[in-house]
Amino acid sequence: MVVEANKKELICSFCSKKQHEVKKLIAGPAVFICDECINLCMDIMEEESKIALKQITSTIPTPQKICSVLNDYVVGQEQAKKVLAVAVYNHYKRLEYVQSGNNDVELNKSNILLIGPTGSGKTLLAQTLAKILDVPFTMADATSLTEAGYVGEDVENILLRLLQAAEFNVAKAQKGIIYIDEVDKIARKSENPSITRDVSGEGVQQALLKIMEGTVASVPPQGGRKHPQQDFVQLDTSNILFICGGAFMGIDSIITSRTNNSSIGFAANVNIDKEKINREILKSLEIEDLTKFGLIPEFIGRLPIVTTLDDLDKEALVTILTKPKNAIVKQFKKQFELDEAELIVEDSALEAIAEKALAKKTGARGLRSIIEHLLLDSMYKVAELKKQRVTITEDVVKGLIEPIITSIITPTAKTSKKQAAVEDIPA
């Protein structure tokens, strides 16, 4: 019986063609696939890739429309929004051009570097762009990355997270956006090339070079180090848009030092207003400043578009609290509404919250934690606050008093009282 089974001719498990009818038959666990079926699968995947790209490029809005939607979510940063809108539009138009087969002019990919203080909106800009374009999006923290072979996270894990965001649709993932935060933290330790191995600084920059420029990376679907025997997914990064962001603390002094060197006499020593440093000095940013900060020239070369974000002032922070579609105060008000309670935040309280965030130097990022702290006790006993109004005043923000709780007098209750009074009047 065993001899007869061995003599039985092998067939493709998908098209049922016999071994002698095809060029190659590849064995798997209890299954076989022929070269013709493999080619058919490749054709299907290529067609799906074209359809996925067509869906993205056919619906891509103009730079003005992109900027308009960004305005709904991001306060201020007009120059950064304009630069991003144009860069993203050109990126996806480039994909459409490449897919069309035109090769008369080669269009290079333009990754983006965002430089701005903590809480200025770098991450929110990248997230909102991905939402507008409806493409897979993932974020990575550069501080957790290390060179391959060292303790920490491999660069390929960023691509794995993008694949997960695309539900392992390779064609879709290849048109996605990756945002790498805290990229200033992987600056090399000195301006000169390192003699000792810098595995979390220059080493990470070197590891990022290839995937940012465009390569076919082998991505481990279950993570690289825990499952070394797994099959790899091939992901082409040529059309993935990389946006890097960082605060680059201290780069203003590098710029000032460079620009002051060209000054004459005592003019070079004039104290520069801090506000001017944040808004004007960064506008003089040059590639040599980034190199001096610790980014290697090759890494800077992969980020041809550089834009800066301003420090947010008190007025901008108050606007962030109330105006955007996803404004923090709107979110908390909705949460209270869900429990049939009402939240009121007075204008003076909004200003006090903004001042607190400025004092802590946390920018917009710190606003939510301040409000969370103010409302913690109220949210803890929210079940008892049904038909109650919680009011946050300036004194509440300053910690002088607790949030003020009062009863809500509904219009229906007033109406019923009036009706009762009318009924009591004798005819």
Curated annotation (Swiss-Prot):
Biological process according to GO: cell division; proteolysis involved in protein catabolic process
Gene Ontology MF annotations: ATP binding; ATP hydrolysis activity; ATP-dependent protein folding chaperone; protein dimerization activity; unfolded protein binding; zinc ion binding
A Pfam family it matches: ClpB_D2-small
Domain ClpX-type ZB, first and last residues per copy: 1-53
Binding site for Zn(2+): C12, C15, C34, C37
Function: ATP-dependent specificity component of the Clp protease. It directs the protease to specific substrates. Can perform chaperone functions in the absence of ClpP.
Self-association state and partner proteins as the record states: Component of the ClpX-ClpP complex. Forms a hexameric ring that, in the presence of ATP, binds to fourteen ClpP subunits assembled into a disk-like structure with a central cavity, resembling the structure of eukaryotic proteasomes.
Name the record gives this protein: ATP-dependent Clp protease ATP-binding subunit ClpX
Species of origin: Rickettsia bellii (strain OSU 85-389)
Lineage: Bacteria, Pseudomonadati, Pseudomonadota, Alphaproteobacteria, Rickettsiales
